Structures are given as C-alpha cells and as structure tokens.
C-alpha cells in the first residue's frame, strides 16, 4: 500500500489523475478549503490535496472560536484572543510585560470605586468626574477620590450603580444587560438576518449536511466559504438569540430609553445636586432653585462656584438629606436656601423695578434660564428670579448694541452678570449707568464685575466688613436703599454735572427702555464716593474718612466731585501696605499704623514692627512685653487715650499722619512710646 500511496501522491503532480471515485471524493472536500467552486482542473488536484489540511486549519483559525477568552470581535486583527474590550482582567493567562497593562485592572473597581478602563490609553477613567488616572494602582484610585470627590465614598451601592449605568449610557455601551443585548443589536444583526434569509433562500433545506466533511457543491459551498466549517452553527445560534431579542425590540428600546433617562437624572441629582426637568430639557439647582441655561458641565460648575460654592463641601449624609428635602417639598427648600427676606430693602429693587417695567413694555425675549411652564408647573423657581434674569438679558443686549456679539454665559461673558448674593454678602450694588459695582459701605466704584475685584476692594478699603453679622448687613442695605431712593428723588435736576463720558452710556441705556433709571445710580455712585454713610456704618469708617482726607477730597454733603472723579484713592495710596492694616489691631494689640514709614508702631513700648502681620505682632508682644496680654479693657483704654493725647501734642492729630513730621526739638526722634513711658 505504501508504493500505491506514494504513487498516488506523486502521480497527482500532473501526469495522470487518480480514479474517478477518489476524484469525486476530493471534489466534495475541496470547496471548504479552496477558494474556487466545485470544478477544479485535474492537474492541480494533487496540490489541492496537499493543501487541504492546511487550508482547513487556516479556515478554523480564522473562524471565531466559542471560547471564553474570545469575547471581542473576531476580525479585530489583534495578536492575542483576549481583547481589551472586556471589562475584567484576563482570566487565565500570564502577564505579558510591557504589552498589556490591563493586567492590573480589576472588575470590582468599577462598582466599588467607580473606575472604568480606557483601552485606548491603557489607563483608568473616573466615572464620577471624568478624570484620567496616571497609573493602574489602588493607591492612585484612593488618592484621587480623597482629593477630588471624597463624598462619593458614602454613596450606597444603588447610587454607584446609577452612576455606572449613566457612564455606560454616556459612552453608548448600554446601561444594563438588556442595554447590551439591545445596544449591540443594530446594523450587524440586521446584516446577519439578511444573510440568514439569503442562505435560507439559497437552498439550505435542499442541501442538508451529510457528514462532518461532506457538503454539496451548490449554495452550501458559498455558505461554507463565508464562515468556515463551524461558522453556520455559531451564526445560527447568534441569529436565533437575535430573533428572540428582536421580537421585543420595540418595547425593550422604549424601556431602555426610559431607564437611561432615569439614570441620567439620578446622576445629576446625586453628583451635581441638579434636578432634571424633562419638559424643558433643563437642569434646576436643588440648592437655590434656579434653572441652568444648558446641560453643559461648564454651566453647572460656573453656577455652583458663583452662587453657592459651599455646597461643594457637603458630606454624603448632608447630600442625602438635601435630596430627601428636595423630593419632599421643593418650595420649602427653595425658601430655606434663598437669601433672607431683607432683599426687599436692598438697592437692587431700584433698578429691578425699572427693568421690570422696561421688559414688560418691550417684546418678551427668550428666557433661557426659566421657561414659564417649568416655573408654574414644577414650582422650582425661587421667589424673585425675574429681575436678575432680566438684568442679564438687558446687559447682553447692551453688549450686542455696543458691538459685542451675544455669547453664552461661559467664557468672558460672565463678567457682565452680577450675582444677587453680592448685595447682602458683600454689600455690593449694581451700577446700571456704567455697568459696574458700587460698594454699599464706602461708596467706591469697582472696575469690573469679578469676585477678585470685590475681595481686593474689601481687603484694601474696609476689611472689617467681612465680619459683620446678618442684621448689621441688612441694616446697611436698608440705609443704602433709603439714601439711594432719596438721591433718585433728587436726580432729575442734576444731569448737568461735569461728567464727560456719562451721557453716551446713558443714551445707550435709554435705548433699552430704562435710561432715566439707569442714569441715576451713576450719580448715586459718584456722590456716595464722597458722602459718608449714616451712623449704621461699621467701625472702619473713620479709617476711610481719614484716607479721603489724605487724598484731599472734601467731605461735603452734596459737593460735586473734582474733574477727575474716580472715587477710589490713587494707585500709589491704594497699593501701599496700609491695605493690610486691620483697625481692630488698635484696640486688640495696641498697634497703630505709621503712615510715614508704612509700618506698625507699638503703643506700649514705641517699637516699630517690620511687617504688617499678626504673627509679627504676637511675636513682638511675647518677646518684649508679654504682660500686656493681661491688660484689662480699662487699662487698654487708658493707654489709647494717653497715646492719642501725645499724638495730638506732637503731630496735631491722632496717631501717625501720612507725612513724616519734622523734628521739633533739634532732631529728637519722636516716638509714641514716650506716651506710655510718661
């Protein structure tokens, strides 16, 4: 038999073929491995016979194996069968150093720490904030959570599952098992169904398989060329599963869409404290009840940082309590989170009323922040959001007429939108004439609508106003409102004041429909820059009046400002170290400010301090005269009176003045310490 076998294999090279039975058998076995039909040349039969096993192996190697490791698509072109599309780490293979960093990612990190794997960069992505982590380490995960969002550690497993489903919905992966079954179904399964129909129409019943390696040479050959020997069985299984799932595709798709919307809403509620309004496709803040212009994360971040930054530090139980309170009674929660009812006395009403009338007279513009149906039906809008929104719209209109196209609240446009909380929190009022801010404590005009400008102004002019309580701030706001109303009543006969650049601004404001009302806050700001406030002002007013006197401004009642009318002091004076001097140091530490040296002088020993810092004051007291810490209030008052009397005798006014006084006794250096030693 061996020679015969050798003769068959050698004779198949091209001289003569084998018998007809062998040729017919080989003709049946060639199509699965070959690339041609059933008709093959006789001289190539031997070569095809030698390539049969290799071709079959090649087709088996290219066919998708029903293995647990081959979870990704079979045609991805990767070298290894376990692709990075799977979520967990590789189940049973050793590590490949330098190639697959996925070996460090664990599936339980997804629900325990809300960390997903990004196969594109072989790293982790936080599903809470979207940040990319540097390494695949548990320590990196814990450090990221502690630094970015420690409150997520207190979330329940159900809340974490909501975040995970929302993340999958965001990536388009499907939020649950049904989502994966329905989301993956799509064009691929439709194509498979079409292929199945074509195969059924091509004669699948007419050509049933007769054996493990035998197949008819008709349509079945085309079918086997497509997927290999085991492809039809796997395709039938997949298509039967797709048919069962496709039977309820319409109902499942609707259910999936509803679940995704619910999970997205729950994610906004748990993470951002934002409730989603499906009717208007908007977000409503659960801390203040205001509607946001869009679903963009930049708008959410800007709103939280500008309106209530304290909500970022809420713990998990506090957030849960806020969610429960919002779900139970949103109106009561909005009343609790809103400003005190003293807003009616705030000077914002002076411009708000005029802008209310102006907006009522004109055509109603598109209010992106609060649609009327959401206001009336959901009850999510606070008591008085109208004036603030109309101010923003009017200011946007002013920017457009001035040549600035209307932009979204993100970017530089946020400088045109003052915040209502500035009235009582920082005692800052909007000046409609020049589109700036006016300080309700000292009457100074601020250059821009920025928090940094407000904080710098308060730190330089009256740092003690930050420690005022709510009743004192309400009293100052009430007095400011009364004085502003009085100035508005006296406003019409005063437009002839020497104000060069004001008429164009007021003319542009009059185009908006509120020109007269917006012209008067400008006069109010310029007059209040020189007029001291009523006795309800804080203790920092004497220092401010002293600065005004040093600058040479006359504190007249209604005197007109000089031709250069900026109320703040000149830049050299505003940038000196005096801005860091706290008036309370005078009574608390017995420290006075020396304007000639721009430093501190101790009233007890007369020593000069190097820097304007509390640490320097305390170190000086501990090193030189620690007994002064035990002084009673009466003793401190006695030292203050003696110091002021000596200063009056030496310099002609209380304390050290701005100019350095010339020595009177032939070069004797005058110090305030002589007062206490005397």
Swiss-Prot record:
Biased composition (Basic and acidic residues): 79-88, 573-583
InterPro entries referenced in this protein's UniProt entry, alphabetically: SPIN-DOC_Znf-C2H2, Znf_C2H2_type, ZnF_transloc-Spindlin_int
UniProt GO BP: negative regulation of DNA-templated transcription
Keywords linked to the UniProt accession: Chromosomal rearrangement, Isopeptide bond, Ubl conjugation
Biased composition (Low complexity): 62-78
Biased composition (Pro residues): 492-504, 560-572
Site description Breakpoint for translocation to form ZFTA-MLK2 fusion protein, residues in chain: 138
Keyword Ubl conjugation: yes
Biased amino acid composition, Acidic residues: 187-201, 388-398, 513-529, 543-553
UniProt key word Mitochondrion: no
Domain of life per record: Eukaryota
Cross-link (Glycyl lysine isopeptide (Lys-Gly) (interchain with G-Cter in SUMO2)): 375
GO cellular component terms, semicolon-separated: nucleus
UniProt disease link: A chromosomal aberration involving MRTFB is found in 3 chondroid lipomas. Translocation t(11;16)(q13;p13) with MRTFB produces a ZFTA-MRTFB fusion protein.
Protein name (record): Zinc finger translocation-associated protein
Organism of this sequence: Homo sapiens
